[in-house]
Swiss-Prot record:
Record's protein name: Uncharacterized protein KIAA2012 homolog
Keywords on record: Coiled coil
Composition bias type Low complexity, residue spans: 538-549
Extent of Basic residues compositional bias: 431-441, 807-819
Keyword Coiled coil part of the UniProt annotation: yes
InterPro entries referenced in this protein's UniProt entry, alphabetically: DUF4670
Coiled-coil stretches noted in the UniProt entry, renumbered to this chain: 743-804, 907-1112
Compositional bias annotation for Polar residues: 584-603, 743-752, 870-884
Biased composition (Basic and acidic residues): 268-296, 768-802, 895-945
Length: 1147
């Protein structure tokens, strides 16, 4: 309501001094009548089915009539509550406890604003200019279904409240156990004064949550499905004390992403007891039955599937790469480990920072035990037969498992991890199963069956068309793994290694024949077993895969069954058939030349039979400068441990020349395709007892090496065609159960293959040295990055074969090189420019791979149908960049050996030329687009500069005009002041002259008056003199007359003298009476004149009084008339009837 005036409060004001009470109006009184309508809340549904919306209708206000109009005293509309009229008619009595709430509920600040300002909502547009109310800028109908954006989470506000508390209170509450959430205390900063603590404005719009710059792009761009399970990154901070349910995680995260089947809920206590019971037999369970391994793999896969989540949009992303946190923890998960049971609890954490010191309970991967402690847990044979040249990355210091310290975490949460070692790469590596004791030590449940694993494997392959669209380049690095560090202490969830595990040598430069695989070849990644150091030991020298690193964050990778789940994950991922390698030709020689290639060749033959996987790191598509940065970073971090690897640079540079010019390397789309038709149908081979051969080979060299392709397998060797499914077998236990028969068959095939490869390589080396060397220097980075996904695995496999066989057979290495070259040519033919087409990819997977018609062709063909579904690893950890092309290697070796080398060379040249032309066209188009963009930018810059110049010129002109105007104003002001001064001087001079003239005139008047006075005095004196002379003459005459009369009297007689005396007295008497009469007349005349003067004076006074009265009357009359006119002018708006103002306005 308006502010009440004196009149409405019952007060008046005395006006003038007549003791008359006059009404004194205030401005508030004149504003009341300006409100033509008022509003009350009336229930009126805007749409059917929604009766909670209201409108505001007209209500006549209460008024007070005065002699000059109507005054609005108050309005009932402002005093009515938000109850609807129907509710108010139900009765005044309602119990306090069961009082019905009003229909109009205020949920947001906008609703409150509507309730406060609703009486001004429906005003007419033309009336809003003079109404003194606030109005809505938009109609309420458009805001009925408005989405409300939530603010910060409750934890954020609680932390903001905790900042205002004194540190002593927070400490008391924490010590008393009332505050158990360490995340709430994380930002409280108890040891920092209040004035120095960072303050957050919780009243504004919440900012976007900050992510680390090392996150891969698909986490941020495609983070919708990833963040679906988290629901709120900030609310996840409160989850440090709770345990996430596996089924709920799958349910929450399966909204947008492709979610794996949920698991059966199994209590962690059962897993922990199994861990304690079975860990005692860890060193004695080396030779375990085949069924136990299969059941363990199945159980591990089922537990992994319960937490795995991936989205097809991630697989199709063309710039995605995975960042691996070496020695640190993943930002989106926090794992807490209890003191004695080792239970891993998965929590959703903030993505804005990492923990400073990642202890064993927080690390996604357990830290590495010391070398001495690991050797104690190793068998005696493993100590004696370790790889001679294995890369040893720095160890992570052991930390006993401990309970999470909230104070320490909150003080150190803002600092980065001390041992953060970032590899933005994509990783393929071993899939070895740990012993039974190891899996149970981590809380892994007992295995079930292998057929279910095959179903999961085949059901989680995305469609081939989707995968074929992925166009990311890959960069690989060979990182050797040290067997003496594969073993991890029980506190760190690491079990001792088994026999048959050894570290692969680090390779650089030379690509294996598998690296030349076409776009249809599968290249997925998984996580290695506990004996495979990339998973359990981030500091041990191996890195997790890109997709795996991501899924380890979005799945239950932090749980205790980590190692056992890794084994099953790589059951599908073993199609990569590549060792952990990265193409670092341009940065540093990271290769290591093995001392004995014969041992490697024999080991390669064994690896081909067992189908052991090799880890590989695939770096996603990155620009050349970014690739150089990460490559140099990797080189700098690993140089102290790779001094001996520089000798192998020359040996592997030869294969690099062929790789630089490979046609598939020119096609960025085909390079990134993934086809996995081999995994699902070949999972059954894991049940074959083939571990004895692997065990024998592991004593010669590292069992972690995996065969480079199918080139070394004969058509009648099922294991030659099934290198990926043997990854289901645990490497430690497979070592002694593998048959030796396949090793002999594979060695013969390898020797024949390497001879053919060596011949073709010699021919191509001579040609590529002449023609391709200059171009390789210019396009080295591009080719290196492009061929990392296509040609590296083939050459690395063939190179490893040659190294393994050269230990016993020097000629075998030469044959393997020849056969490797043939594989390279065959892969080039099969992976042509048209390899992007998904149909051709399926055709090649069906027919192009198996032209020999061997006995193993049926399983391969049958698995082709399931390829689109089983294209990624079971746990969903395969990154979009984990792609490779392998159609060439899948072709039987006999067909490749019988092909015409010249024809293959011509086909390869044509494909290389087409690829170069296509690449050149793409570069030209990119250059054109870049030039166009730069031209547009230059035009825009010129336009902006022109506008800026024009704006500056206009501002300059306006400034000049303003200055001129000011100068003119100053000049006019000075002129006006000068004129005023002159006028004042003239006025003063004129006044002075007038004063002088007046003084002169007064002086003259005084002189004239004095002169007249003197003349009158002189005349008066003269008259007095004449009168005195006349009187003196008269007296003299009278004396003479008296003397003559006396003389005459003496001469006269007595009688005559008496007569004379009598006449003389009569004459004197007559003169005296005449004088008296004249005096009486003069006196009477003076009296009459005085009376007449008095009468005239009275008449004049009477006339003057009458004139004064008349003037006063006229003055009073004029004053009254003017005052009346002023009064009438003020009160003119009030002459109408107040009903005129209370009429209902027209709609």
């Amino acid at each position: 309501m308006f502010t009440l005036s004196l009149l409405s409060r019952g007060h008046g004001k005395l006006v003038q001094n007549k003791q008359k009470l006059e009404v004194y109006f205030e401005p508030e009184d004149y504003l009341n009548w300006k409100s033509p309508e008022d509003y009350i809340l009336v229930r009126k549904p805007q749409d059917e089915g929604n009766a909670d919306q209201h409108t505001w209708s007209l209500f006549l206000p209460k008024t007070f009539s005065t002699r000059k109009g109507a005054l609005i005293l108050y309005s009932e509309g402002l005093a009515i509550s938000a109850w609807t009229p129907e509710e108010r008619r139900k009765g005044p009595y309602r119990p306090k406890g069961r009082r019905k709430r009003p229909d109009l509920e205020l949920h947001t600040l906008q609703d409150l604003k509507e309730a406060i300002l609703a009486y001004g909502r429906r005003q007419r547009e033309q009336d809003r200019a003079w109404q003194p109310y606030l109005h809505f800028r938009s109609q309420p109908e458009s805001q009925g279904l408005r989405q409300i954006q939530p603010g910060y989470s409750a934890k954020r506000y609680l932390r903001g409240l905790l900042r205002t508390w004194p540190p002593g209170t927070i400490n008391k509450l924490q010590c008393a156990g009332y505050i158990k959430d360490s995340v709430l205390l994380q930002d409280s900063q108890l040891n920092v004064p209040k004035n120095l603590r960072p303050q957050q404005d919780l009243s504004g719009v919440p900012l976007k949550y900050h992510l680390l710059p090392v996150f891969p792009p698909f986490w941020i761009q495609q983070g919708k499905s990833f963040g679906q399970g988290q629901q709120d990154l900030d609310e996840g901070e409160a989850g440090a004390g709770g345990q996430v349910d596996q089924g709920s995680v799958v349910k929450d995260r399966g909204i947008q992403g492709t979610c794996l089947p949920p698991l059966k809920k199994q209590p962690w206590q059962k897993d922990e007891t199994q861990t304690e019971d079975t860990s005692k037999d860890n060193h004695h369970c080396i030779h375990t039955s085949k069924e136990n391994h299969q059941e363990k793999a199945q159980q591990t896969s089922r537990r992994t599937l319960g937490h795995a989540l991936f989205d097809h949009s991630w697989l199709l992303h063309d710039k995605s790469h995975t960042t691996f946190y070496y020695g640190g923890t993943f930002p989106n998960r926090k794992a807490d480990l209890s003191d004695k049971q080792g239970t891993m609890k998965l929590h959703q954490g903030r993505s804005s920072h990492l923990f400073k010191e990642p202890p064993a309970e927080r690390c996604l991967f357990p830290p590495v035990a010391s070398a001495a402690g690991s050797e104690k847990n190793m068998p005696g044979d493993m100590k004696k037969k370790k790889a001679p040249k294995a890369l040893k990355l720095p160890l992570i210091s052991e930390e006993p498992p401990r309970v999470l310290d909230p104070l320490r975490s909150q003080l150190k949460a803002s600092e980065p991890p001390a041992e953060l070692f970032i590899f933005p790469v994509e990783i393929h590596y071993h899939s070895q199963h740990p012993p039974k004791g190891k899996a149970q030590r981590r809380g892994a449940p007992q295995p079930e069956s292998a057929p279910e694993t095959e179903e999961y494997t085949s059901s989680w392959r995305p469609p081939l068309k989707q995968v074929s669209l992925r166009g990311s380049r890959a960069l690989r690095v060979h990182l050797p793994m040290d067997t003496d560090r594969d073993t991890l202490s029980p506190q760190e969830d690491v079990a001792p290694p088994q026999k048959g595990t050894s570290s692969p040598s680090l390779r650089k430069g030379k690509k294996s024949p598998e690296s030349q695989r076409g776009p249809d070849s599968p290249r997925t990644s998984g996580r290695s077993s506990p004996t495979g150091p990339p998973c359990e030991r981030p500091a041990g020298g191996a890195l997790p895969a890109a997709g795996q690193a991501y899924e380890s964050v979005s799945s239950n990778a932090g749980h205790g069954e980590e190692e056992s789940s890794i084994q099953h994950l790589l059951k599908v991922n073993t199609e990569s058939r590549t060792d952990l390698h990265m193409n670092l030709n341009e940065t540093s020689p990271l290769t290591q030349k093995p001392e004995n290639q014969g041992a490697q060749q024999s080991l390669e033959a064994a690896a081909q039979k067992t189908g052991e996987p090799q880890s590989c790191i695939n770096k996603g598509l990155i620009c050349s400068n970014r690739k150089e940065f990460y490559t140099r970073k990797l080189h700098l971090d690993m140089t102290p441990f790779l001094k001996a690897s520089r000798e192998e640079m020359d040996d592997h540079e030869e294969g690099g020349e062929l790789r630089e010019n490979h046609p598939d390397a020119q096609d960025p789309v085909r390079r990134n395709m993934t086809l996995d038709p081999l995994c699902a149908s070949l999972a059954k081979h894991m049940q074959t007892p083939e571990a004895d051969t692997v065990q024998k080979a592991s004593k010669d060299y590292n069992v972690h090496h995996r065969h480079r392709g199918l080139s070394g397998h004969g058509p009648d060797s099922p294991e030659g065609l099934d290198p990926i499914d043997t990854s289901f077998l645990p490497r430690g236990k497979e070592g002694k159960t593998e048959p030796r028969l396949f090793n002999q068959k594979t060695s013969n095939n390898i020797s024949n293959e390497m001879e053919l490869i060596e011949k073709a390589k010699s021919r191509k080396r001579a040609k590529t040295d002449k023609s391709k060397a200059p171009k390789r220097e210019k396009e080295g980075k591009l080719h290196e990055e492009a061929e990392a996904a296509v040609g590296k695995s083939k050459e690395s496999k063939a190179e490893k074969k040659s190294q393994l066989i050269s230990k016993g057979k020097k000629t075998g290495a030469k044959g393997k090189r020849t056969r490797k070259e043939g594989n390279l040519e065959t892969a080039a033919e099969l992976s042509g420019p048209d390899g992007i087409n998904s149909k051709e990819t399926k055709d090649r997977s069906g027919g192009g791979f198996f032209r020999s018609g061997s006995g193993v062709e049926d399983p391969w063909v049958s698995s082709k149908v399931e390829a689109p579904e089983s294209q990624v690893s079971i746990d969903g950890r395969s990154s979009p960049t984990q792609t490779a092309a392998v159609p060439g290697n899948m072709e039987p070796e006999e067909d490749r050996s019988h092909e015409d080398p010249s024809k293959a060379f011509l086909v390869k040249r044509e494909q290389e030329k087409a690829s170069r032309d296509r690449l050149r066209a793409e570069r030209a188009e990119m250059r054109r687009l870049e030039v166009e963009r730069k031209r547009r930018e230059q035009e825009e810059q010129r336009r902006l500069q022109q506008e800026q110049l024009e704006r500056a010129e206009r501002m300059k002109e306006e400034l000049e005009l303003e200055q001129q105007r000011r100068v003119e104003e100053i000049r006019l002001r000075k002129q006006r002041l000068e004129e005023e001064r002159q006028w004042q001087e003239e006025e003063e001079r004129r006044q002075w002259l007038q004063l002088q003239m007046a003084q002169e005139r007064a002086r003259q008047q005084q002189e004239e008056f004095r002169r007249k006075c003197q003349e009158l005095q002189r005349k008066k004196q003269q008259e007095e003199a004449e009168r005195a002379e006349a009187e003196k003459q008269r007296l003299k005459e009278l004396e003479m007359q008296l003397a003559e009369e006396q003389k005459h009297l003496m001469e006269m007689a007595e009688e005559e003298r008496l007569e004379y005396q009598r006449r003389k007295q009569e004459a004197e008497e007559k003169t005296r009476w005449e004088a008296e009469d004249r005096r009486q007349k003069e006196k009477e005349a003076a009296r009459l004149a005085q009376e007449e003067a008095m009468k005239q004076a009275q008449d004049q006074a009477r006339q003057k009084d009458a004139l004064k009265k008349h003037l006063h009357f006229h003055q009073e009359l004029h004053k009254e008339a003017s005052g009346l006119q002023w009064t009438h002018n003020i009160s003119r708006p009030w002459v109408y009837s107040y009903f005129h103002f209370l009429q209902i306005p027209r709609p």
